[in-house]
Amino acid sequence: AIPAMFYACKKDTYTTKPQISIKSISSKNISQGDVLLFSIDFTDKEGDIQDTLWVQKISRICPTTPGAQFIQANRVPDFTATSNLKGTLEIGYGYNANVQGYSTISGCGTRNDTCYFKFWLKDKANNVSDTISSENIVLLK
């Protein structure tokens, strides 16, 4: 599930294609059992972002290790669309742990995994944002 915080704004600079940016990352060094949390800011002219936030994890160290990389579709919570919508989506992952409310991610197993995440947002009218990438994140073995 993706928690969402949003509010309407009177600016005319919003576009039909959703705009996203990374507001924050909980940590760049994650120990096993920790939650990695991303806050993604968004704007949308029509406010119809209630479709899908896509996430891709890319390992720089062990790309062929099963489970070290993935692409995941995450449903954005349904709400009443408001023009010129601005807000924050939060998505998190439990690292090698079953944490209620979060998907689980894994790393390289026997060594640290340096990875990064890509995000893109699709709205109800099938408009897709640009793809954004996180900084490197280290999943400690």
Tell me what each language-model feature is.
Residues K10-D12:
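Bacterial signal peptide processing site
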Residues M5-A8:
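C-terminal motif of bacterial Sec signal peptides marking the signal peptidase cleavage site
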Residues K17-K141:
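First exposed extracellular module after export/assembly in secreted or surface-exposed proteins
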